């Protein structure tokens, strides 16, 4: 993957689930919802001045959310929610947003 390019989708790992869990309170505050299910399904990464991680989340009842998480160049696991897209389906591709 080149600098700035988005990787191919990969199956979510326990590390990706941990990252999603860290930004879950930020997402729930922004959407004003509590998600009973919050399971990472797949992800893509993008190397910038740090790293963007795009994660497809299964939030239950056939609903999915795409989240964009940023980790700064310090590499200190300072994850921040930088965007999200609601009303997604399992079949929708994760894309840059």
Swiss-Prot record:
A motif (Secondary area of contact) lies at residues 46-50. Its main location: cytoplasm. CDD domains: CY. InterPro entries: Cystatin_dom, Cystatin_sf, Prot_inh_cystat_CS, Prot_inh_stefin. One of its GO terms (molecular function) is endopeptidase inhibitor activity. It is found in: Cytoplasm. Keywords: Cytoplasm, Protease inhibitor, Thiol protease inhibitor. PROSITE patterns: CYSTATIN (PS00287). It holds the Pfam family Cystatin. The record marks 4 as: Reactive site. SMART domains: CY. Coiled coil: none annotated. It comes from the Eukaryota. GO terms for cellular component: cytoplasm. Belongs to the cystatin family. This is an intracellular thiol proteinase inhibitor. PANTHER family: CYSTATIN A FAMILY MEMBER 3-RELATED, CYSTATIN FAMILY MEMBER. This is Stefin-1. It comes from Mus musculus (Mouse). The gene is Stfa1.
């Amino acid at each position: 993957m080149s600098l700035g390019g988005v990787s191919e989708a990969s199956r979510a790992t326990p590390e990706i689930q941990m990252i999603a869990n860290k930004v879950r309170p930020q997402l729930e505050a922004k959407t004003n919802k509590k998600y009973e299910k919050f399971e990472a399904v797949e992800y893509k990464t993008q190397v910038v001045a740090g790293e963007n991680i795009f994660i497809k989340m299964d939030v239950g009842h056939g609903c999915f959310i795409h989240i964009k998480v940023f980790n700064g160049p310090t590499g200190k696991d300072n994850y921040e929610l930088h965007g999200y897209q609601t009303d997604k389906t399992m079949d929708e591709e994760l894309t840059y947003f």
